């Protein structure tokens, strides 16, 4: 019964192939929302307030500095997700072995027998994609939208027109983080102007600027609330070292092979260098000493198989 339910849940993803037609339209939509917001906050309301003098100018300057900083970080993170390949399986990839610890080649073990006819295996390091006709590492999944296997695939995101996987998952999380902060800021600073629409006082401005302010407030409020939900969900996934796909696959499993504790789970996504935690990038040292950032190998609990 559980197997049937899982199959029904995953059949939904066959409709994701229709997402290919969206293409760069979603990127233009994101930039359009940014443009409307920029016009409402900077050009219509708080830019002109800089010339008023006194505390009004100081407050406007503070808001504009914070707004531009968050906007810069948002766009940096966003385009990092868009233009960074999430990670693909190298040609002729084979799982590594540790001869010093007495490990044998998984391809020569009984786990590999019949692998090409069954994508599941008792050895999570040995899996086969019948669509790509190649071996794939653990935590790797085939994306029906991109038509390829993606390392540590989380999901295919229509907003970034790209898969979110091992090599750009951190950038996606930072995009959510800075989007939430930016949209929350815009909602708060435009709220007095939005409330003024429902008062009896005369509101200065042209119909165009007033409509832009109204639209920007509604859009940013909607995005702030929706992104907050996604951000909370992904914080929970990072804490358990789980992807969105894996959360569906193991929804009845209480123990998880890759859950090494919140600190190590966090570092597997954001790296060990704290200076880079809020920046869409990694240090060369982290890339060298943390192979899991490359998406091919992930440490698991030493005693997991004996539990």
Curated annotation (Swiss-Prot):
InterPro entries: Palmitoyltrfase_DHHC, PFA4/ZDH16/20/ERF2-like. The chain crosses the membrane at residues 22-42, 63-83, 171-191, 213-233. GO terms for cellular component: early endosome; Golgi apparatus; Golgi trans cisterna; membrane; trans-Golgi network. It is an enzyme of class 2 (transferase). GO terms for biological process: leaf senescence; regulation of leaf senescence; regulation of reactive oxygen species metabolic process. Its EC number is 2.3.1.225. Keywords: Acyltransferase, Golgi apparatus, Lipoprotein, Membrane, Palmitate, Transferase, Transmembrane, Transmembrane helix. PROSITE patterns: DHHC. The keyword Zinc does not apply. GO terms for molecular function: protein-cysteine S-acyltransferase activity; protein-cysteine S-palmitoyltransferase activity. It is found in: Golgi apparatus, trans-Golgi network membrane. Residues 127-177 form the DHHC domain. The active site is at residue 157. It is a multi-pass membrane protein. It catalyses: L-cysteinyl-[protein] + hexadecanoyl-CoA = S-hexadecanoyl-L-cysteinyl-[protein] + CoA. Belongs to the DHHC palmitoyltransferase family. Palmitoyl acyltransferase. This is Probable protein S-acyltransferase 14. It comes from Arabidopsis thaliana.
């Amino acid at each position: 019964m559980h197997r049937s339910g899982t199959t029904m849940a995953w059949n939904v993803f066959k409709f994701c192939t229709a997402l290919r037609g969206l293409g760069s339209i979603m990127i233009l939509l994101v930039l359009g929302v940014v443009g409307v917001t920029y016009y409402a906050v900077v050009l219509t309301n708080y830019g002109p307030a800089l010339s008023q003098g006194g505390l009004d100018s100081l407050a406007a300057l503070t808001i504009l500095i914070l707004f531009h900083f968050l906007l810069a970080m948002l766009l940096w993170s966003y385009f990092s997700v868009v233009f960074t390949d999430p990670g693909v399986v190298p040609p002729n990839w084979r799982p590594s072995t540790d001869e010093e610890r007495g490990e044998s080649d998984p391809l020569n073990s009984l786990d590999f027998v019949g692998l090409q006819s069954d994508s599941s295996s008792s050895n999570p390091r040995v899996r086969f994609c019948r669509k790509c006709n190649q071996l794939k590492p653990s935590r790797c999944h085939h994306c029906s939208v991109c038509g390829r296997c993606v390392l540590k695939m989380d999901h295919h995101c229509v907003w970034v027109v790209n898969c979110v996987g091992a090599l750009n998952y951190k950038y996606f999380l930072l995009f959510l983080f800075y989007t939430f902060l930016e949209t929350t800021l815009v909602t708060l600073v435009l709220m007095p102007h939005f409330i003024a629409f429902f008062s009896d006082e005369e509101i200065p401005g042209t119909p165009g600027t007033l409509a832009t302010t109204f639209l920007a407030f509604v859009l940013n409020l909607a995005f702030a609330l929706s992104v907050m939900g996604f951000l909370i969900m992904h914080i929970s996934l990072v804490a358990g070292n789980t992807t969105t796909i894996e959360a569906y696959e193991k929804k009845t499993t209480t123990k998880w092979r890759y859950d090494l504790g919140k600190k190590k789970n966090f570092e597997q996504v954001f790296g060990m260098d704290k200076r880079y935690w809020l920046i869409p990038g990694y240090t060369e040292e982290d890339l060298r000493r943390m192979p899991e950032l490359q998406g091919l190998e992930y440490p698991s609990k030493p005693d997991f198989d004996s539990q």
